[in-house]
Curated annotation (Swiss-Prot):
Function: Component of the ERMES/MDM complex, which serves as a molecular tether to connect the endoplasmic reticulum (ER) and mitochondria. Components of this complex are involved in the control of mitochondrial shape and protein biogenesis, and function in nonvesicular lipid trafficking between the ER and mitochondria. The MDM12-MMM1 subcomplex functions in the major beta-barrel assembly pathway that is responsible for biogenesis of all outer membrane beta-barrel proteins, and acts in a late step after the SAM complex.
Organism domain of life: Eukaryota
Protein name per UniProt: Maintenance of mitochondrial morphology protein 1
Keyword Endoplasmic reticulum listed: yes
Keyword flag Coiled coil: no
UniProt remark on domains: The SMP-LTD domain is a barrel-like domain that can bind various types of glycerophospholipids in its interior and mediate their transfer between two adjacent bilayers.
Positions of the UniProt region annotated as Disordered: 303-324
Family statement: Belongs to the MMM1 family.
Cytoplasmic topological domain: 108-405
InterPro entries: Mmm1 (IPR027537), MMM1_dom (IPR019411), SMP_LBD (IPR031468)
Residue ranges that the Swiss-Prot or TrEMBL entry lists as coiled coil: none
Transmembrane segments: 87-107
Length: 405
């Protein structure tokens, strides 16, 4: 562009300088021709030639001026195109740099991530870095001292003083337990499932040769509810670092099961004599101190040798499984109260009613069964379900679902 101006500007300046002179000369020549008579032909011819040359030079300057304007227009279009190209190239370069930054500085390398997840050691290291571990009081020992410190921390943060805190009533808990028992009773009475369950259990039980088949004659599941009261939290005497709740339980109700069987005398030959027997056993009163605590069954003190019973018959129930993880431990204190009402009827024609020896024998066997399973130092362990919310455990009222439709 500068080179073009260098060559064209002198012509433009000359044309602009000569243009007024030529115009003035033309006007003067016209005026001169009109004002006087021209008598000399050579002078007229020279003037005409001069006028033609001026006109030719003017046309040439006009043409060069048009060419200059055309070139300026073309140069402006070329500069516009170059500006557009530069803008596009600049935008593309910025986008490319931004993509490189996101790929290498924001996102992780897929191969590195897969190799890290496949390595067990690195995964454990990452988990240890993710989990926030609070500092514990003391030396952080894993033994009894560390557990005692943990119990003290729990009591401190829950503002509970085990020495001075007054016993609590469990009225709200009694309502929930009563509602649960009521629903169980309603289901048992409507579907007769308790009758079928007991009948199936008795039919599958192995009986001695001198007893005939056992038939159910009476089932009474009661109509009253247990009362829990006087709840207090105490440190466990058997295990350091564990808290337990002691609750007084009182139940005054009538829970009855009646059976009928036959005593068979097989000597000197089978079925020599048959003695009909009818029994009815009722629990009319129970009271005692219930101990409840949460345990971890993976710990050594709650392993199978500690849980196992002494007698071979009562070691473990059939089809039972050893629980793992968090479980509920409960037992009753030895100073419990359990009252029975046993009714018996023996004989076919001449019948013996309520024989004391039979009543004491049955009561002794029932007490032994209860002591071997639930009286301290023995205890029962109930595995607790997972408390994490899950989709399969989610429910909603049926009325809400129908109203939505």
């Amino acid at each position: 562009m500068q080179v073009l101006n260098f060559y064209v500007n002198p012509y433009l300046n000359l044309s602009f300088d000569l243009l007024p002179v030529a115009n003035h000369f033309c006007r003067y020549s016209r005026h001169w021709k009109m004002s006087r008579d021209i008598t000399r032909p050579d002078e007229l011819a020279s003037l005409i030639q001069l006028q033609d040359r001026l006109q030719t030079q003017q046309d040439e300057l006009f043409r060069k001026q048009q060419e200059l304007q055309f070139r300026e227009t073309y140069a402006g279009t070329g500069s516009t195109k170059s500006f557009t190209q530069g803008l596009i190239i600049g935008q593309l370069s910025v986008i490319i740099l931004l993509g490189i930054f996101i790929k290498f500085f924001v996102f992780a390398d897929s191969s590195t991530t897969s190799s890290t997840s496949g390595n067990g050691i690195s995964s454990k290291t990452d988990v240890s870095n993710i989990l926030v571990k609070r500092k514990k009081n003391g030396d952080g020992d894993a033994g009894s001292e560390g557990r005692s410190d943990e119990v003290d921390t729990i009591l401190e943060k829950t503002y509970y003083d085990v020495d001075n805190h007054a016993p609590e009533s469990l009225d709200w808990f009694n309502v929930l337990i009563a509602q649960t028992i009521s629903s169980f009773r309603y289901e048992a009475l409507q579907s007769d499932n308790i009758y079928h369950s007991l009948k199936e259990f008795l039919s599958k039980s192995e009986l001695p040769d001198y007893l005939g088949d056992i038939q159910l004659t009476e089932i009474d599941i009661g109509d009253d509810f247990p009362i829990f009261s006087n709840c207090r939290i105490r440190p466990s005497k058997d295990s350091h670092g564990r808290l337990e709740a002691k609750i007084d339980v009182d139940l005054s109700d009538t829970l009855t099961m009646g059976i009928q069987t036959k005593l068979i005398l097989n000597q000197p030959r089978p079925l020599t004599a048959v003695l009909p027997i009818s029994l009815s056993v009722s629990i009319v009163r129970f009271s005692g101190c219930l101990t409840v605590s949460l345990i971890n069954t993976n710990e050594e003190e709650f392993s199978e040798p500690r849980v196992a019973m002494d007698s071979p018959q009562s070691t473990r129930d059939d089809n039972s499984e050893e629980p793992n993880g968090t479980a509920l431990l409960f037992s009753f204190s030895p100073d419990y109260r359990l009252e029975f009402n046993v009714k018996s009827l023996i004989g076919s024609r001449a019948k013996l009613q309520d024989v004391p020896k039979i009543s004491s024998l049955i009561e002794h066997r029932l007490r032994s069964w209860f002591v071997e399973r639930c009286i301290e130092p023995r205890f029962q362990v109930v595995k607790l379900p997972s408390l994490w919310p899950r989709k399969k455990n989610t429910r909603q009222p049926v009325s809400t679902t129908e109203s939505d439709h």
